A protein has these predicted regions:
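Sequence-pattern detector for short linear motifs
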Residues: 16-17, 40, 56, 84
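Residues in the helix-turn-helix
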Residues: 39, 50, 80-83
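Recognition helix of helix-turn-helix/homeodomain-like DNA-binding domains
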Residues: 28-31, 37, 44-61, 71
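Short amphipathic recognition helices of helix-turn-helix/homeodomain-type DNA-binding modules
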Residues: 1-11, 62-91
Protein backbone atom coordinates (compact mmCIF):
# COMPACT_ATOMS: atom_id res chain seq x y z
CA UNK A 1 0.00 0.00 0.00
CA UNK A 2 1.36 3.44 -0.92
CA UNK A 3 2.12 5.90 1.85
CA UNK A 4 -0.31 8.72 2.32
CA UNK A 5 2.26 11.52 2.50
CA UNK A 6 -0.30 14.28 2.00
CA UNK A 7 -2.46 12.94 4.82
CA UNK A 8 0.54 12.47 7.10
CA UNK A 9 1.62 16.05 6.46
CA UNK A 10 -1.89 17.41 7.14
CA UNK A 11 -2.17 15.44 10.37
CA UNK A 12 1.26 16.59 11.60
CA UNK A 13 0.51 20.23 10.81
CA UNK A 14 -2.93 19.99 12.43
CA UNK A 15 -1.31 18.75 15.65
CA UNK A 16 1.16 21.66 15.60
CA UNK A 17 -1.41 24.48 15.42
CA UNK A 18 -2.65 25.94 18.69
CA UNK A 19 -6.43 26.53 18.68
CA UNK A 20 -7.43 30.21 18.70
CA UNK A 21 -10.43 30.79 21.00
CA UNK A 22 -11.36 33.95 19.09
CA UNK A 23 -11.92 31.90 15.93
CA UNK A 24 -13.17 28.61 17.32
CA UNK A 25 -15.09 29.49 20.48
CA UNK A 26 -15.43 26.19 22.36
CA UNK A 27 -12.02 25.20 23.71
CA UNK A 28 -12.75 22.42 26.14
CA UNK A 29 -9.73 20.47 27.39
CA UNK A 30 -8.20 18.33 24.65
CA UNK A 31 -6.83 14.80 24.79
CA UNK A 32 -4.35 15.59 22.02
CA UNK A 33 -2.65 18.86 21.07
CA UNK A 34 -3.59 20.95 18.08
CA UNK A 35 -6.74 21.40 16.07
CA UNK A 36 -9.50 18.87 15.62
CA UNK A 37 -10.32 17.75 12.07
CA UNK A 38 -13.63 19.59 12.26
CA UNK A 39 -11.85 22.80 13.22
CA UNK A 40 -9.41 22.60 10.31
CA UNK A 41 -12.33 21.97 7.97
CA UNK A 42 -14.24 24.95 9.37
CA UNK A 43 -11.24 27.28 9.09
CA UNK A 44 -10.49 26.07 5.54
CA UNK A 45 -14.11 26.32 4.37
CA UNK A 46 -14.47 22.57 3.82
CA UNK A 47 -16.81 19.91 5.11
CA UNK A 48 -15.42 17.81 7.93
CA UNK A 49 -16.07 14.69 5.84
CA UNK A 50 -14.05 16.01 2.90
CA UNK A 51 -11.12 17.02 5.13
CA UNK A 52 -11.20 13.60 6.81
CA UNK A 53 -11.07 11.88 3.41
CA UNK A 54 -8.05 14.01 2.45
CA UNK A 55 -6.23 13.20 5.66
CA UNK A 56 -7.01 9.49 5.37
CA UNK A 57 -5.91 9.35 1.74
CA UNK A 58 -9.36 8.52 0.38
CA UNK A 59 -9.32 11.67 -1.76
CA UNK A 60 -6.02 12.63 -3.33
CA UNK A 61 -6.65 15.45 -5.78
CA UNK A 62 -7.66 18.62 -3.92
CA UNK A 63 -8.12 21.79 -5.94
CA UNK A 64 -5.85 24.80 -5.64
CA UNK A 65 -8.60 26.62 -3.71
CA UNK A 66 -8.80 23.76 -1.20
CA UNK A 67 -5.02 23.73 -0.79
CA UNK A 68 -4.97 27.49 -0.24
CA UNK A 69 -7.70 27.17 2.39
CA UNK A 70 -5.79 24.42 4.15
CA UNK A 71 -2.57 26.44 4.04
CA UNK A 72 -4.34 29.35 5.73
CA UNK A 73 -6.10 27.16 8.31
CA UNK A 74 -2.86 25.37 9.19
CA UNK A 75 -0.89 28.63 9.29
CA UNK A 76 1.69 27.37 6.80
CA UNK A 77 4.70 29.50 5.93
CA UNK A 78 5.88 29.78 2.31
CA UNK A 79 8.07 26.69 2.47
CA UNK A 80 5.40 24.51 4.09
CA UNK A 81 2.79 25.81 1.63
CA UNK A 82 5.02 24.82 -1.30
CA UNK A 83 5.51 21.40 0.27
CA UNK A 84 1.73 20.98 0.65
CA UNK A 85 1.20 21.77 -3.03
CA UNK A 86 4.03 19.41 -4.07
CA UNK A 87 2.54 16.57 -2.03
CA UNK A 88 -0.89 17.16 -3.55
CA UNK A 89 0.54 17.08 -7.08
CA UNK A 90 2.44 13.86 -6.34
CA UNK A 91 -0.57 12.08 -4.84
Amino acid sequence: MARNELGEFLKARRAAVAPDPRLLGDLRPRRVPGLRREEVAQLAGLSADYYTRLEQGRHRSPSEAVLNGLAEALELDTSARQHLFALARAA
